């Protein structure tokens, strides 16, 4: 008995339709993280892509960024986040294609 790949694909699609939670658990969103001023100095880059599960927050993205760029811990307590050019709390939901800016403390004189 030969396996029919089309039948297997159809069965998998039906299973995903029957269980949207399982399908959502596998869904990922890509967020572009932007680094400014001291954050850029600490990372050595102006931007980096981050992929997180659908339903993630700005804080989830930040956790991934901090894991990838541990030197950012130096400014962690004073940084501000902006999601799509609007200041945002860490519990703000992120979506595919969003931009998350890490804004370090600003000083002047």
Swiss-Prot record:
Matching Pfam families: ThiS
Pathway(s) served: Cofactor biosynthesis; molybdopterin biosynthesis
Primary location group: cytoplasm
UniProt keyword list: Cytoplasm, Molybdenum cofactor biosynthesis, Nucleotide-binding, Phosphoprotein
Residue list for modification 1-thioglycine: 109
Signal sequence coordinates: none
Cross-referenced InterPro entries: Beta-grasp_dom_sf, MOCS2A, MOCS2A_euk, Mopterin_synth/thiamin_S_b, ThiS/MoaD-like
CDD domains: Ubl_MoaD
Post-translational modification Glycyl adenylate, affected residues: 109
Top-level taxonomic group: Eukaryota
GO biological-process terms attached to the record: auxin-activated signaling pathway; Mo-molybdopterin cofactor biosynthetic process
UniProt GO cellular component terms: molybdopterin adenylyltransferase complex; molybdopterin synthase complex
Record localization: Cytoplasm
UniProt region (Disordered), positions on chain: 1-21
Gene Ontology molecular function terms on file: molybdopterin synthase activity; nucleotide binding
Post-translational events: C-terminal thiocarboxylation occurs in 2 steps, it is first acyl-adenylated (-COAMP) via the hesA/moeB/thiF part of MOCS3, then thiocarboxylated (-COSH) via the rhodanese domain of MOCS3.
Function: Acts as a sulfur carrier required for molybdopterin biosynthesis. Component of the molybdopterin synthase complex that catalyzes the conversion of precursor Z into molybdopterin by mediating the incorporation of 2 sulfur atoms into precursor Z to generate a dithiolene group. In the complex, serves as sulfur donor by being thiocarboxylated (-COSH) at its C-terminus by MOCS3. After interaction with MOCS2B, the sulfur is then transferred to precursor Z to form molybdopterin.
Subunit structure, interactors included: Heterotetramer; composed of 2 small (MOCS2A) and 2 large (MOCS2B) subunits.
Similarity-based family: Belongs to the MoaD family. MOCS2A subfamily.
HAMAP family: MOCS2A
PANTHER family: MOLYBDOPTERIN SYNTHASE SULFUR CARRIER SUBUNIT
Protein name: Molybdopterin synthase sulfur carrier subunit
Originating organism: Oryza sativa subsp. indica
Source species taxonomy: Eukaryota, Viridiplantae, Streptophyta, Embryophyta, Tracheophyta
């Amino acid at each position: 008995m030969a396996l029919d790949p089309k039948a297997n694909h159809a069965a998998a699609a039906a299973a995903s339709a029957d269980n949207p939670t399982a399908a959502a658990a596998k869904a990922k969103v890509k967020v572009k993280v932007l680094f400014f001023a001291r954050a850029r100095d600490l990372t050595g880059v102006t931007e980096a892509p981050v992929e997180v599960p659908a339903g993630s927050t700005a804080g989830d993205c930040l956790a991934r960024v901090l894991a990838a760029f541990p030197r950012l811990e130096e400014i962690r307590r004073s940084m501000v986040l902006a999601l799509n050019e609007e200041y945002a709390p860490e519990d703000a939901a992120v979506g595919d294609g969003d931009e998350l800016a890490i804004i370090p403390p600003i000083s002047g004189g």
